[in-house]
Regions:
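Short, conserved charged micro-motifs
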Residues: 34-36, 71-74, 146-153
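Short, low-complexity cationic-aromatic patches
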Residues: 14-16, 32, 127
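Aromatic/basic-lined ligand-recognition segments
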Residues: 6, 59-137
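N-terminal low-complexity, intrinsically disordered segments
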Residues: 1-28
Length: 175
């Protein structure tokens, strides 16, 4: 039997979901900065680590943004990415994963971080609005099996790195 616990603000702007092997912290607060979100995450993680006897064995920061556009603009983006002319797919997706190594200031501990980017064309409201969009999903995470001691040692650097990676991707893909 799998148990889960979900905590949330009444307005749903902050949710903490506990599953059998993870805790997800999700914010949908409009206009929130990464720094504010990170401060909230730090507080929640500190409360959890103080009150629960579990070590953090993996970190991840995810973000999504939809760029609304007409079908012609969506096809222009596809043509640039696929380098194929005169092709009109009804659905397309591009995914890439880059890796970064984060090391403590003294160089004694390090972790490998995946920077995952996925672009997908999408119809924003199927059946109602035929306007297209491009969905950018980003997932910055540590590798499964990384030492909990190493994760703890680079946790601050991870959050700074992950929020910077996502900010840079949002700016890059807007253009």
């Amino acid at each position: 039997e799998v148990l889960s616990l979900n905590l949330k603000y009444l307005d749903n702007t902050l949710k903490v979901n506990f599953g059998p092997d993870r805790a997800d912290i999700e914010s949908t607060k409009a206009g929130e900065t990464w720094e504010t979100f990170r401060t909230t995450v730090d507080k929640i993680v500190n409360i959890l680590s103080t009150n629960m006897n579990h070590r953090v064995v993996r970190l991840a920061l995810c973000g999504s943004i939809i760029y609304s556009m007409d079908e012609d603009k969506s096809m222009q983006i596809y043509s640039k990415l696929a380098k194929i002319k005169n092709e009109q797919p009804v659905e397309w997706q591009l995914r890439k994963v880059l890796r970064t190594k984060l090391t403590t200031d003294d160089g004694t501990k390090s972790v490998i971080v995946n920077n995952v980017y996925q672009l997908t064309n999408t119809i924003l409201i199927p059946g109602i609005n035929t306007r297209d969009g491009v969905l950018l999903d980003m997932d910055v995470n540590t590798l499964v099996g990384t030492s909990a001691d190493n994760i703890l040692a680079v946790q601050g650097k991870f959050w700074t790195h992950a929020s910077s990676v996502i900010d840079e991707a949002v700016v890059h893909y807007q253009s």
